[in-house]
Curated annotation (Swiss-Prot):
GO biological process, alphabetically ordered: defense response to bacterium; defense response to fungus; killing of cells of another organism
Keywords from the named record: Antibiotic, Antimicrobial, Disulfide bond, Fungicide, Lipid-binding, Plant defense, Transport
Taxonomic classification: Eukaryota, Viridiplantae, Streptophyta, Embryophyta, Tracheophyta
Descriptive protein name: Non-specific lipid-transfer protein 2
Tissue-level expression: Detected in seeds (at protein level).
GO MF annotation: an example: lipid binding
Keyword Chaperone assigned: no
Length: 25
């Protein structure tokens, strides 16, 4: 699951990246 997978929704992509930034694995 990556930003490229949710390219259909830029908002989802942003939230995905934000979530990763807030919770670094």
């Amino acid at each position: 699951d990556s930003c490229q997978d949710v390219k259909q929704s830029l908002a989802d992509c942003l939230m995905y990246v934000t979530g990763r930034a807030l919770k670094p694995a």
